[in-house]
Amino acid sequence: MSVLPCSINTLKVLYDISGVEVGQHFYWQIGGFQVHAQVLITSWVVIAILLGSATIAVRNPQTIPTDGQNFFEYVLEFIRDLSKTQIGEEYGPWVPFIGTMFLFIFVSNWSGALLPWKIIQLPHGELAAPTNDINTTVALALLTSVAYFYAGLTKKGLGYFGKYIQPTPILLPINILEDFTKPLSLSFRLFGNILADELVVVVLVSLVPSVVPIPVMFLGLFTSGIQALIFATLAAAYIGESMEGHH
């Protein structure tokens, strides 16, 4: 007879833990609008980290690079190679866009894997990595969509829309639908992976000693980096595809 109360208590504990998964949003009221303050705060932190580290590393550029300058030159070379591989010979103007996407997502993801934002106590709501919020990932995906439309129209003019009836006009609905599925897949893939990783870290830190979650955190760092690479690679591939034609 004691099985039922025990099961109910177990379910209650699991339900309480699942509350971390849903979370509480931290809002600012600006005029008549509710703003997701947790996204703005953590995004500002990420931007400050990127700008601060870049400024410190290259404030005194040397002919023979120092450690910091050498690291950022390596990152730039990596992003240039990625852009050239996916976009082609006309990759140059798109390096800043692809680089910004990659670095912002990479540092945002790592902040979620290294910093248990949700444990930070606030009067109400909670903090989370920027990419833990669906609004951020959707915004990044929409920026990518705008970028590849702009790239295609700039290269081909109105002839860009001819891709929708290739190789046959019968595929017009599917080709149009593809433009909606691209940002959806980009945004939900990034959001789902980062949310799951951050929740695992938060739950383990809450339930077990701090040493135990370390392997999970290292795995989170790896997957976070992979997700940033996937997003940047797909963004560059979409831009390259829009400039070259429909494949």
UniProtKB/Swiss-Prot annotation:
Its main location: plastid. The chain crosses the membrane at residues 38-58, 95-115, 134-154, 199-219, 220-240. It holds the Pfam family ATP-synt_A. The keyword Nucleotidyltransferase does not apply. GO terms for molecular function: proton-transporting ATP synthase activity, rotational mechanism. Belongs to the ATPase A chain family. This is ATP synthase subunit a, chloroplastic. It comes from Buxus microphylla (Littleleaf boxwood). The gene is atpI.
